[in-house]
Amino acid sequence: MGAQFQRHGTGVFRTKLNKADHPIMKGFGGFESWDETYVHHLHNENNRTVLELRAEGKEMEPWTWVRTQGKGRVFYTAWGHDNRTWGNPGFQNLLERGIRWAAKDDTSTVPAYLADLPFPIPEMTPIAKNLKPFEFIDAGGKIPNYTPGEKWGVQGEAFTKMQKPLEPDEALKHVSVPKDFEVKLFAAEPDIGGKPIAMTWDERGRLWIAETYDYPNELQPVGAGRDRIRILEDTDGDWKADKSTVFAEKLSIPSTMTFHKGGVIVQNGTQTLYLKDTDGDDVADEKKVIFDGWVLGDTHGGVSNFQYGHDNWIWAMQGYNNSSPTINGKRTQSFANGFFRFKPDGSEIEFIRSTNNNTWGIGLSEEGIVFGSTANRNPSVYMPIPNRYYERVNGWKTNLRLGSIADTHLFDPVTKNIRQMDHHGGYTAAAGHALYTARQYPKEYWNRTAFVNGPTGHLVGAFVLKPNSSDFSSTSPFNLFASDDEWSAPIMTEIGPDGNAWVIDWYNYIVQHNPTPAGFKTGKGNAYETPVRDKKRGRIYRVVYKNKSGKPFSLENASPELLVSTLANPTMLWRKK
């Protein structure tokens, strides 16, 4: 048969489809049903092809498969406990396909079943097989090796070899994207002067990046940092950066930024700053401290993801550092691990809702619905009701933590060369949750697909959002971006002025911040110290659909008429300018 039943639970679920080119799977989009959640053991993988898998904890459980036995054929599926599945048209369609295949009949006579498909899963472009082989160098035992298993943080013998980094043009060849999409390079080192950690765009469509050298263990005193904000501009309309201007320097770990009234609000280590250029030379000459006193004992547990909200507040995320920032010397409420918002002038700040983990991800839909992501198996979060509504009820405790809405935390990399400390095979460091709020991509993406970065898996997952009455669920049936280059580490994806997704590739062989592996020391930023951690490489990519980039657009010195007409622009970034 191919395996033996071991145990089961129950639930409503849908499977992950596999082998789309198999005769049984052509034209089959899957379905959702209540059923028993079978787990098998004693697997016989000889001559077996798995067609469906179901998420089971940290693993993907084979669910439907075919195999050959002598001259015979076997079709097996774990679906089918009772009438809830047997009465499902999707199951009936799958069963007919399986029976016809096992009987060596023509499966193409079975009608396509796509009615229950949440998203037409795209075919992925293959990575070419004739590329130059990766080169490896001696790392001297400086690469930690955590072994997969039920026990957390188990280390094996350290790796002694590591892959050499690739040049930007060569790295592009190692990326897989959906069919009809293409990855294009906008900027890379040496035009970027450090590790790109955040990005946004101004009213002229120019890319602004925060670049860091001080992260993770070298947070500097105020005014003594080595980090910058840089403007990267395309002056000739080819969608490649050809002009670079340093807007601000002497910063330290500038983790996020957004625009307000001709200036930029920047989270600079322990301070939230407002920086502005007043004389037109694209160099900041005015500075105001909006908030001070943010805790940054752990540099990957701070503030991130400034998003200008529909309510004219700045929305953001606070990591697991417990902070109570000050406004004009007065201490505000203390909070950690969750969504917060503040008025751009710093007059008010409000903690919105707790997540269940350290967090670096927020995304706003076109309606202003709020989503996010966290570390440790929680790549997709929905924020339904702010704490302030619960606080109006006397005696109501508001320690309500938001869990995952995703059907699984597991991801789907294109390489086995993945190094993770925990939650092996899944999102342990999910970052961002940017909804596709433009119209260059196919219609099924519009305002219902979010892009979540998985740097340890070298990928950006696409999460399809589904409203369920007053709640949401999400599933990630494919990747927007996936690389087999061990240095590739996407940390931020946002929708750019051209209506395409732009990706920051941190491009670092070492992604892990903490805990500190055996044999290593903990640095001042609570990240383990290693000379292998890169300080100079970083790339900005655009994921373009059918070469649709649009024409460069600008609202600089825009007339009232242009501003009003821009409210109908298909890209939300421009509507919010």
Enumerate the predicted regions with their spans.
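Catalytic beta-strand/loop cores that center a nucleophilic Ser/Cys/Thr
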Residues: 2-72, 78
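Generic recognition of short, well-ordered alpha-helical interface segments
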Residues: 19, 23-26, 93, 428, ...
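Sec/Tat-exported extracytoplasmic proteins
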Residues: 28, 102-106, 464, 544-547
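Beta-propeller domains with acidic blade repeats across secreted/periplasmic ectodomains
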Residues: 121-568, 574-577
